[in-house]
């Protein structure tokens, strides 16, 4: 099951050339970028691990691409994403986020249903990947 999080998530994986064009756009708008990775793909897992330091005031997309390549090399079976942060007063939030690396095998999720009082059903998602210990999931 393909993980769909962030911008471009329903499109085929971006090529390095396409990623570089997006990074050029991010830099041209004066946004800060950072690279994050995780092996816990749950949709509510918003706290991914930060790769290096955030890239403030970067003027060249190749610096961000270098960090992506380094992260991919060190964490080949992890999800890796790029976030673009706008520090403009009044916005001050992530304005773009997209996945640039994913594991070769994405096992998907188990939908757990639970009967509750008054014939109510409660649902929860469980990632098959998290059945293995952290660092050995893919």
Curated annotation (Swiss-Prot):
InterPro entries: RuBisCO_ssu, RuBisCO_ssu_dom, RuBisCO_ssu_sf. Its main location: plastid. In this alga, in contrast to plants, the small subunit is encoded in the chloroplast. GO terms for cellular component: chloroplast. The keyword Transit peptide does not apply. It holds the Pfam family RuBisCO_small. RuBisCO catalyzes two reactions: the carboxylation of D-ribulose 1,5-bisphosphate, the primary event in carbon dioxide fixation, as well as the oxidative fragmentation of the pentose substrate in the photorespiration process. Both reactions occur simultaneously and in competition at the same active site. Although the small subunit is not catalytic it is essential for maximal activity. The gene is rbcS. SMART domains: RuBisCO_small (SM00961). This is Ribulose bisphosphate carboxylase small subunit. Belongs to the RuBisCO small chain family. It is found in: Plastid, Chloroplast. The lineage of its organism: Eukaryota, Rhodophyta, Bangiophyceae, Bangiales, Bangiaceae. GO terms for biological process: reductive pentose-phosphate cycle. Coiled coil: none annotated. SUPFAM superfamilies: RuBisCO, small subunit. Keywords: Calvin cycle, Carbon dioxide fixation, Chloroplast, Photorespiration, Photosynthesis, Plastid. GO terms for molecular function: ribulose-bisphosphate carboxylase activity. Heterohexadecamer of 8 large and 8 small subunits. Gene3D superfamilies: Ribulose bisphosphate carboxylase, small subunit (3.30.190.10).
